Amino acid sequence: MYFDKSKLQKMSDEITLTLNERIDKMELVVKAQSILIGQDERGNSYQSNILRLINDMARGLLNQCQSTMHSHRVQRNYRSTESIAWTIEEFDNYIESFNTTTKLFRDTLERFWPTRNFEPMATEAKISTVRVRFEYLRDELIKTSQAG
């Protein structure tokens, strides 16, 4: 469905804010995981190395999200909501993988150090996808276009 450029731009701006929020939270998770890894008293143990690999995967997914975000900002004039949806779909796939990586990090920590309590940001954070926000904005855009 095609809409007025200014309305699509407003929607794009809202999505940009949402993407930034998700990226900020992902950065906090990656940093919290790095801090936990640094707290291993034995230093460069194989457990820490495994956790570093998992943290590197999370960092890579964060970088992919930042790249998608950059593409979204560069794509200034969307022609349709479908083109915004493609960006959202790509971003959400990375978020879902990031959440899986966070769960793997938590499971690995619990296996290596079952009696310790860990920073919830590093082990329990679940980043919500952007799809719901996009669908809400799209539905509002359709309503206002039909009413006006």
Regions found by a protein language model. Name each.
Residues 24-148:
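Long, low-complexity or tandemly repetitive, helically biased scaffold regions used
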